Amino acid sequence: MPVEITVKELLEAGVHFGHERKRWNPKFARYIYAERNGIHIIDLQKTMEELERTFRFIEDLAMRGGTILFVGTKKQAQDIVRMEAERAGMPYVNQRWLGGMLTNFKTISQRVHRLEELEALFASPEIEERPKKEQVRLKHELERLQKYLSGFRLLKRLPDAIFVVDPTKEAIAVREARKLFIPVIALADTDSDPDLVDYIIPGNDDAIRSIQLILSRAVDLIIQARGGVVEPSPSYALVQEAEATETPEGESEVEA
């Protein structure tokens, strides 16, 4: 497993910054190092230990040709989730999680089929034969399906695992995966319940730098495990954009 993350990189990405104490989940206590100014600090040695365990699982799954569904619908995770999942050739959900995406997979797959039907229709001359009012209605339907299912459409069967950014926000996705005994990987902050996650990466799940570092290295590992060539991730540009919009206090406007 040559892909590695150092403690220095974790520190620079702010992975150690948790939430305010008033927002913590007591079950997360074993991953907390200290409290400073009312903010919990995550123990990066514990993060490193869990990263090694989690990355070994991801590597093994990738080598066996397994599929990981990436899930991250919060604003600061959306673009990173999309870019990294696409880089890995994996399905993703970065808009709203539609209830039943896993537990009612057959019905959701029918919506994907509808999406493909509409795309084919709009790519053919037949669409011009439809009344204008119907064209507008179908276009609206197409855009909605594309928004919510563009990343999910790659999933032809239930995934072998899901990788969520913030299991508290993505509670429905986590609950559906657990119901179907699908392993849950998660970048989880101090407000999370570790007992709901099979492979936890204790860390800041709000900062763009933290999300990008963890997801890009996980995807590097997937690519490498499948015999591909790892190249610099284009999602790092999002980190640079965040740095360019930082306020004088050092807090990114995007991360706020």
UniProtKB/Swiss-Prot annotation:
Keywords recorded for this protein, A-Z: Coiled coil, Ribonucleoprotein, Ribosomal protein, RNA-binding, rRNA-binding
Alphabetized Pfam families for the sequence: Ribosomal_S2
GO cellular component, one term: cytosolic small ribosomal subunit
Coiled coil: 104-149
Alphabetical list of InterPro entries matching this protein: Ribosomal_uS2, Ribosomal_uS2_bac/mit/plastid, Ribosomal_uS2_CS, Ribosomal_uS2_flav_dom_sf
A biological process term (GO) from this entry: translation
Single annotated GO MF: structural constituent of ribosome
S-S bonds: none
UniProt xrefs under SUPFAM superfamilies: Ribosomal protein S2
UniProt keyword Ubl conjugation, yes or no: no
Keyword Transit peptide applies: no
Function: Spans the head-body hinge region of the 30S subunit. Is loosely associated with the 30S subunit.
NCBIfam families recorded: rpsB_bact
Family: Belongs to the universal ribosomal protein uS2 family.
Subunit structure: Part of the 30S ribosomal subunit. Contacts protein S8 and may contact the N-terminus of Era.
Protein name, UniProt field: Small ribosomal subunit protein uS2
UniProt lineage: Bacteria, Thermotogati, Deinococcota, Deinococci, Thermales
